[in-house]
A protein has these predicted regions:
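RNase H catalytic domain
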Residues: 6-13, 50-126, 130, 135, ...
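Short, mixed-charge aromatic SLiMs
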Residues: 73-74, 151-155
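RNase H-like nuclease fold core
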Residues: 1-47, 53-61, 129, 137-146, ...
Length: 155
């Protein structure tokens, strides 16, 4: 089994943000993080999960994802995201990331475990640390889809 621990953070919503991921299986351990200049907490939570899953090269893996994001866990476990696909994400945010998530989701056997954030869970705390550090980097990435959508709303 592969364990993926994730967290996302943003300073302001929207604002600078980042995500942190830990992949752990047996002796293998990897940390990943990235920061964006303008994004939202939910986008960073979702990017953490996507990045973790996209890091797994062999399909058909049994994966446990640990997240403190009810947004993601409820969307998948309560099947909301599959209904959003049927309605072409009408009035829903983060379509680009949900479609990207679904591409990797179908390649594996995935389960989610909710962990309470900022409650002493070592891997969640480390992912939070990675996410916050990433959001404070000098050369932040551009969340192109988000910034383009936000620009449309403000025109």
């Amino acid at each position: 089994m592969i364990n993926i621990y994730t967290d996302g953070a943003s300073s302001g919503n929207p604002g600078p943000g980042g995500f942190g991921v830990i992949l752990h299986s047996g002796k293998h351990y990897k940390e990943i993080s990235e920061g964006y200049r303008k994004t939202t907490n939910n986008r960073m939570e979702l990017m953490a999960v996507i990045t973790g899953l996209e890091s797994i090269k062999n399909p058909g893996q049994v994966i446990m994802i640990y997240s403190d994001s009810k947004y993601i866990i409820d969307a998948v476990e309560k099947k909301w995201v599959f209904n959003w696909v049927r309605t072409n994400f009408k009035d829903k945010k983060n379509k680009d990331l949900w479609l990207r998530f679904l591409e990797v989701y179908k390649k594996h056997q995935i389960q989610f475990t909710w962990v309470k954030g900022h409650n002493g869970h070592p891997e969640n705390e480390r992912c939070d640390e990675l996410a916050v550090q990433a959001s404070k980097q000098m050369n932040l990435l551009i969340d192109i889809y988000f910034e383009k959508e936000e620009l449309k709303l403000n025109l």
